[in-house]
């Protein structure tokens, strides 16, 4: 039995006593205890692939702040790593793959990894974290979106231009659709396995959906997100595991995402919550959408922005604050002040009381 089920209730658009709050990358380098754990573990991957260390890091922000959820400490690129692309990290450059897939032959060789063998470390981490949380708050599991994972798999790492994957979209769309189909199968299996291991809410990160034109988004990202929402078994009624579809730069597609079958849509700060709520039309909960840079502001500025965000959602939702989870519009940065996170969380709790 959960002691704090605000997140799950809000994602399912049920009444809550205040707006729940959690933060993307709430377990991260801005915390000195995280940096100490990373120094001890030796690398990011060493932490992510050790269930006990992943649990330790997941719980660190909850030991500091009264957040309404824990999110699994992992990476969106675990699926392609398990497919054989071999993930590694370069300091200052981010994630890379030793074996990117750039032609039809390489793409057709890919298969869906076995979740309890190649990705057992993720499921073990979920199980350990659930045990340690002991019902205090829900645990969120997650995956990258098919389009975002395909970007990394084809580019071989992060990119500014996405030239290789966009060239494939124009020159060999059937090959790209084959890749996206295989990755979607894997994402559905991955999220289902996390749910079976104990994840109580699930989020898909479509980090790079916003680099697509509207026509390409509707061809190469949205259909696969919709397939996940339709095919991922999440239970029924009050016990249903809510699914959040988050995307950077997805404001123009809120109405499409609200029709996808997911329980919630996560938006960034490039659309007002009032506008997003009007587009959603009460079909889904909304999550967001403070600009992470707000945390560089003074405590008073942070409180002001929290108030504006809460009010903006209510303005677009017929005056009601139900069906909203307050979050950032993207992840936290390493140079942010932990004390400012405390200010943000306290402001949400105080200003959103029903």
Curated annotation (Swiss-Prot):
SUPFAM superfamilies: UROD/MetE-like. CDD domains: URO-D. PROSITE patterns: UROD_1, UROD_2. Pathway: Porphyrin-containing compound metabolism; protoporphyrin-IX biosynthesis; coproporphyrinogen-III from 5-aminolevulinate: step 4/4. One of its GO terms (biological process) is protoporphyrinogen IX biosynthetic process from glutamate. Belongs to the uroporphyrinogen decarboxylase family. This is Uroporphyrinogen decarboxylase. It comes from Xanthomonas oryzae pv. oryzae (strain KACC10331 / KXO85). The gene is hemE.
């Amino acid at each position: 039995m959960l002691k704090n089920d605000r997140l799950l209730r809000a994602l399912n658009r049920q009444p809550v006593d205040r707006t729940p709050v959690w933060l993307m990358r709430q377990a991260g380098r801005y915390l000195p205890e995280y940096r100490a754990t990373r120094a001890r573990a030796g690398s990011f991957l060493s932490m992510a692939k050790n269930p006990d260390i992943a649990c330790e890091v997941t719980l660190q922000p909850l030991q500091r702040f009264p957040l309404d959820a824990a999110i699994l400490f992992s990476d969106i690129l675990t699926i392609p790593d398990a497919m054989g692309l071999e993930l590694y990290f370069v300091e200052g450059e981010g994630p890379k793959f030793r074996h990117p897939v750039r032609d039809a032959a390489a793409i057709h060789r890919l298969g869906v990894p076995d979740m309890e063998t190649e990705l057992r470390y993720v499921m073990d981490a979920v199980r350990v974290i659930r045990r340690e949380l002991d019902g205090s708050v829900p645990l969120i599991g997650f995956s990258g979106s098919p389009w975002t994972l395909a970007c990394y798999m084809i580019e071989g790492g992060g990119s500014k231009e996405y030239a290789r994957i966009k060239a494939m979209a124009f020159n060999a769309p059937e090959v790209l659709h084959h890749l996206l189909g295989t990755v979607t199968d894997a994402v559905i299996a991955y999220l289902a396995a996390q749910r079976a291991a104990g994840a109580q809410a699930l989020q898909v990160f479509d980090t790079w959906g916003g680099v697509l034109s509207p026509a390409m988004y509707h061809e190469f990202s949205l259909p696969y997100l919709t397939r996940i929402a339709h095919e991922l078994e999440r239970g029924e009624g009050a016990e249903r595991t809510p699914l959040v579809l988050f995307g950077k730069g997805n404001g123009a597609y809120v109405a499409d995402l609200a029709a996808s079958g997911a329980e919630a849509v996560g938006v960034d700060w490039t659309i007002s919550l009032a506008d997003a709520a009007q587009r959603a039309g009460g079909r889904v909960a909304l999550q967001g959408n403070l600009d992470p840079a707000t945390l560089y502001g003074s405590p008073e500025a942070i409180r002001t922005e929290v108030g504006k965000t809460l009010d903006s959602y209510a303005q677009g939702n017929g005056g009601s604050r139900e069906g909203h989870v307050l979050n950032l519009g993207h992840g936290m940065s390493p140079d942010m002040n932990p004390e400012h996170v405390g200010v943000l969380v306290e402001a949400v709790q105080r200003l959103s009381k029903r």
